[in-house]
């Protein structure tokens, strides 16, 4: 009888462990089309849909932890969360801990944009002394030397959507945006109101990384992400939100193909 009870307990514990949620971290500065946060909880968006589909295909419930951006990496290191998506290794040169990275899932250019209805190509180094709309805490390697010499000044907003709103309101002549956010923002504007790219600042491949822990089905997660990418599911999710293929960018206008840190995320 005692052996039978012990066996039942082990089965019960195994069942609970099997249903432990897959914990994703989401920076609270993310906005659409990445994620829409409602009362601190994600409800829709490209990355929300991808993460939810990943957990479903892995066979685990998804659990989302919305944290200030400054706490995201610490949460990974402390084992509070298991997966971080929309990241690149070059953003985390001081990364400590044991992680395994997925294949690249998205390619995301950072753009210098303007409200000018007839934009011309711009070399940032030729810009006169002025403020550039940027996201608080984000790094822009191509522009940093110009910030360091005070040729340009950062005009920080808390998230990418606010940067675009300020540009639309005429607070700045130029701002920095990722391609997704620009495409999403322009969807609600009339053609003569839309914001336009004048140069590609940098372009970065981004993916997910997983905490390498025996409690986390790391290889199952990585294999599932490969399937989702190769099947076209991830690209189709992007198209669902930004409407067709992202606007083409002129590679000849790229000032530097140097990876940035958290571009537009």
For each of these PLM feature ranges, what is it?
Residues 18-97, 134, 156, 221, ...:
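Extracytoplasmic small-molecule ligand-binding "clamshell" domains
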Residues 28-30, 106-111, 187-226, 245-261:
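Periplasmic-binding protein-like
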Residues 51-60, 102-103, 124-128, 136-158, ...:
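Ligand-binding cleft/hinge of the Venus flytrap
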Residues 61-68, 151-166, 198:
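Short beta-strand-to-loop elements that line the ligand-binding cleft
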Residues 64-126, 136-140, 198-200:
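Acidic, polar ligand-binding/catalytic clefts
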């Amino acid at each position: 009888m005692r052996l039978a009870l012990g066996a039942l307990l082990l089965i019960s514990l195994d069942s609970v462990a099997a249903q432990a949620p897959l914990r994703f971290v989401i920076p609270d500065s993310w906005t659409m089309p990445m994620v829409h946060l409602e009362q601190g909880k994600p409800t829709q968006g490209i990355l929300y849909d991808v993460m939810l589909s990943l957990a479903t295909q892995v066979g685990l419930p998804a659990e989302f932890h919305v944290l200030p951006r400054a706490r995201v990496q610490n949460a990974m290191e402390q084992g509070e969360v298991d997966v971080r998506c929309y990241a690149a290794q070059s953003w985390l040169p001081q990364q400590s801990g044991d992680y395994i990275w997925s294949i690249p899932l998205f390619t995301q250019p950072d753009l210098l944009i303007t409200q000018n209805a007839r934009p011309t190509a711009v070399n940032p180094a030729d810009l006169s002394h002025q403020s550039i709309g940027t996201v608080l805490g984000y790094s822009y390697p191509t522009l940093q030397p110009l910030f360091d010499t005070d040729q340009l000044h950062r005009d920080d907003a808390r998230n990418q959507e606010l940067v675009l709103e300020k540009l639309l309101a005429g607070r700045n002549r130029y701002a920095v945006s990722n391609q997704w956010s620009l495409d999403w923002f322009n969807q609600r504007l009339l053609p003569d109101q839309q914001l336009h790219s004048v140069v590609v600042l940098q372009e970065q491949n981004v993916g997910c990384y997983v905490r390498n822990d025996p409690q986390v089905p790391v290889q199952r997660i990585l294999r599932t992400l490969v399937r989702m990418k190769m099947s076209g599911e991830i690209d189709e999710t992007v198209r669902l939100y930004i409407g067709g293929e992202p606007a083409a960018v002129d590679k000849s206008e790229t000032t530097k193909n140097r990876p940035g840190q958290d571009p537009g995320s």
